[in-house]
Amino acid sequence: MTRKTLAIEGLTATTVIDGQQRVLVDNLSLGVQRGRILALVGASGSGKSMTCSAALGVLPPGVTASRGRVTIDGVPYAANALRGRHVATIMQNPRGAFNPVRTMRDHAIETLQALGKLSSNPQDQIVHCMRAAGLEDVKTILSLHPFEMSGGMLQRMMIALALLSEAPFLFADEPTTDLDLVVQLRVLELLEKLVEERDLGILLVTHDMGVVARLAHDVAVLDHGRLIEQAPVMDIFQTPGHEVTRMLVSAHLSLYGMELNA
C-alpha cells in the first residue's frame, strides 16, 4: 500500500545581516510519510526549526522563503492551506504558546473556530482529543489556566489541540524540551501511539539523539541549512556517512561511556 507523503521540495530561506544575504535553509528537500516519524537533527542554528517555519509560511520578520514548495502526493499546497488542515504543529515551549488569561476550554474553542470546525456542541470532540492525548480529568483541565498546569500537562494539551485539526501530518518542534525524563518518556510514548493508531506522519525536530533513537524511523541531518545525510535510524547510528552525523552520534554515545565503531 502506498502511503500518503508530504514532500518539501527545494526549500530556501534567506535573511540579510549587515547588508549581506545569508542563507538559513539551502535548497532543502525531504519527505514525510504517514505512519512514520522523520527526525530532523543537527547542531543549534543548523536550520531545523527554520525549515518547519518556512514550509508552513510562518517565518520571523526579516526572513524570506525565496523558493521551494510543499506537496502532498505530488499536489502543491500554499502554506496557508497546509497549516492546521493538513499539518498540525506542536512547539517546544508550550507554556509560551498559550494565552495566560484564557482557560483550556477557551483555547480549544478558539482552535476549532480557526479551523472552521466549531459545531453547536463541540464538547464531545474536545473531550475525545484530550483523552487521546492522555488527559483524563477533562472537566477540571478545561477550566484551568496555563499557569495552573505542569509542563507535561501543557504539552499534552497542545497535542490535543493539534488532534482537533484531524490533520494527517504533525510538525513537532523539540516536543520534550524542558520536560523531566519521566514526562519526556510519556510524551514520546504518546506520539508513538498516535502514529500507530491515527497513521500520523511526524516531522520531529530535535537535538536529542536519545529521542531520535527511541522514536524515529528515519533521520535527516542538517548542517548550516543544508541536508547532508538522510537514512533509516539504524543506519544513522551504526554507519553514519557524514562527519557531522558522526559527531552527533559520537557525542550521544559518549554520554553512556560508549564509542562509535570506526
From Swiss-Prot:
<feature type="domain" description="ABC transporter">
    <location>
        <begin position="6"/>
        <end position="249"/>
    </location>
</feature>
<comment type="similarity">
    <text>Belongs to the ABC transporter superfamily. Nickel importer (TC 3.A.1.5.3) family.</text>
</comment>
<keyword id="KW-1278">Translocase</keyword>
<dbReference type="InterPro" id="IPR017871">
    <property type="entry name" value="ABC_transporter-like_CS"/>
</dbReference>
<dbReference type="InterPro" id="IPR027417">
    <property type="entry name" value="P-loop_NTPase"/>
</dbReference>
<keyword id="KW-0547">Nucleotide-binding</keyword>
<dbReference type="GO" id="GO:0005886">
    <property type="term" value="C:plasma membrane"/>
</dbReference>
<keyword id="KW-0997">Cell inner membrane</keyword>
<dbReference type="InterPro" id="IPR003593">
    <property type="entry name" value="AAA+_ATPase"/>
</dbReference>
<comment type="function">
    <text>Part of the ABC transporter complex NikABCDE involved in nickel import. Responsible for energy coupling to the transport system.</text>
</comment>
<dbReference type="GO" id="GO:0016887">
    <property type="term" value="F:ATP hydrolysis activity"/>
</dbReference>
<dbReference type="GO" id="GO:0015413">
    <property type="term" value="F:ABC-type nickel transporter activity"/>
</dbReference>
<keyword id="KW-0813">Transport</keyword>
<dbReference type="Pfam" id="PF00005">
    <property type="entry name" value="ABC_tran"/>
</dbReference>
<keyword id="KW-0921">Nickel transport</keyword>
<protein>
    <recommendedName>
        <fullName>Nickel import ATP-binding protein NikD</fullName>
        <ecNumber>7.2.2.11</ecNumber>
    </recommendedName>
</protein>
<keyword id="KW-1003">Cell membrane</keyword>
<comment type="subunit">
    <text>The complex is composed of two ATP-binding proteins (NikD and NikE), two transmembrane proteins (NikB and NikC) and a solute-binding protein (NikA).</text>
</comment>
<dbReference type="InterPro" id="IPR050388">
    <property type="entry name" value="ABC_Ni/Peptide_Import"/>
</dbReference>
<dbReference type="GO" id="GO:0005524">
    <property type="term" value="F:ATP binding"/>
</dbReference>
<dbReference type="GO" id="GO:0016151">
    <property type="term" value="F:nickel cation binding"/>
</dbReference>
<keyword id="KW-0406">Ion transport</keyword>
<keyword id="KW-0067">ATP-binding</keyword>
<keyword id="KW-0533">Nickel</keyword>
<dbReference type="InterPro" id="IPR014138">
    <property type="entry name" value="Nickel_NikD"/>
</dbReference>
<keyword id="KW-0472">Membrane</keyword>
<dbReference type="InterPro" id="IPR003439">
    <property type="entry name" value="ABC_transporter-like_ATP-bd"/>
</dbReference>
<feature type="binding site">
    <location>
        <begin position="42"/>
        <end position="49"/>
    </location>
    <ligand>
        <name>ATP</name>
    </ligand>
</feature>
